[in-house]
């Protein structure tokens, strides 16, 4: 007896239309299966991006499901702006000299969330974007907590919207002060300071400062779960692009936890992640303690894939080779 796969496409006219099979029949994927996530793989020119465009336009235009597209190159998704069924689509090109700027303060976090939880998540974002060997993650965590305290925050305080947020530049200065006051040997102190200032400093220099070193964000944390957006990451460079990608996924993850919805037969939000090998790598015996950002980001995204399914968040990943991810 052959039992069909639960995730197999169907020929009934329901759900997302994928196209036609070799016999000319229309093929669909039931919408409720998308919350189990999806992977599109194929060589360049095989139609991955076209398929992602097709699926995202259906989700937003026909089902009114908000989508977030994280596009590392080519700027092809801005074509969705011509879709009359997606009038509320926002396209951002952070770091580029153009008319689609994006500003996001990493220290902003959803109302109702405890600060200590966001600090933990933000440290994971840094670990996934930059190579941080011990004790650098601890120093980043301590620096983040201290700059919040400078604004009157306490770690176990719940965000009620009444306090101001720190900035990346404040973290840059705070980490240097923490190291100056530490008991590390002079050479170790100097090396740690140089490493951290290079990494954090990359988020405040030139165009990056216009993106991350800002007092307020273009969209509030809550709006990211409601808006349909395309983020063009090409102008950021790999580290900053990974930082922004993980930061946005973190905000959505925090919002989903804060505002869970009862079980329903469709996703409430969908993230499209192009060129996923930039963040996700093959299984490895490497220990996260070696400071490998790819190991940390892979672990973070794998955990998120497992967690957000129950929260009706779908993640659609596209890449050339499945073996480059697994």
Located regions from the model:
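H-loop/switch region of ABC-family ATPase nucleotide-binding domains
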Residues: 319
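Basic- and hydrophobic-enriched, low-structure N-terminal and domain-boundary segments
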Residues: 1-43, 50-57, 62, 85-87, ...
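A generic structural signal for alpha-helix starts
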Residues: 46-47, 239
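Conserved beta-strand position immediately N-terminal to the Walker
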Residues: 38, 231, 316
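P-loop NTPase motor domains
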Residues: 54-313
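Conserved H-loop
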Residues: 323-326
């Amino acid at each position: 007896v052959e039992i069909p796969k639960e995730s197999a496409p169907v020929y009934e006219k329901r759900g997302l239309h994928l196209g036609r099979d070799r016999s000319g029949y229309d093929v669909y994927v039931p919408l409720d299966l998308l919350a189990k996530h999806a992977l599109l793989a194929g060589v360049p020119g095989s139609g991955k991006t076209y398929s992602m465009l097709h699926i995202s336009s259906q989700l937003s235009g026909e089902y009114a499901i908000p989508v977030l597209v994280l596009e590392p190159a080519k700027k092809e998704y801005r074509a969705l702006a011509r879709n009359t069924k997606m009038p509320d689509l926002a396209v951002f090109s952070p770091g580029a000299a153009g008319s689609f700027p994006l500003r996001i303060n990493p220290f902003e976090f959803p109302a109702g969330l405890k600060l200590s939880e966001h600090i933990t998540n933000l440290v994971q974002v840094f670990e996934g974007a930059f190579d941080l060997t011990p004790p650098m993650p601890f120093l980043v965590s301590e620096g983040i907590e201290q700059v919040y305290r400078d604004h009157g925050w306490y770690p176990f305080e719940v965000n009620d919207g009444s306090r101001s947020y720190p900035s990346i530049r404040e973290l840059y200065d705070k980490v240097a002060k923490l190291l100056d006051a530490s008991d590390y040997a002079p050479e170790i102190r100097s090396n740690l300071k140089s490493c951290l200032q290079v990494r954090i400093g990359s988020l405040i220099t030139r165009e990056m400062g216009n993106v991350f070193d800002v007092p307020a964000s273009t969209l509030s944390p809550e709006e990211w779960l409601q808006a349909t957006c395309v983020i063009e990451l090409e102008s950021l460079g790999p580290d900053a692009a990974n930082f922004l990608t993980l930061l946005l996924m973190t905000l959505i993850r925090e919002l989903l936890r804060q505002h869970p919805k009862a079980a329903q037969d469709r996703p409430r939000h969908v993230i499209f992640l192009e060129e996923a090998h930039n963040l996700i790598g093959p299984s490895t015996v490497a220990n996260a303690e070696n400071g490998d950002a790819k190991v940390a980001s892979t672990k973070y995204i794998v955990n998120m894939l497992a967690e957000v399914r129950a929260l009706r968040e779908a993640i659609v990943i596209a890449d050339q080779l499945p073996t480059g991810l697994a």
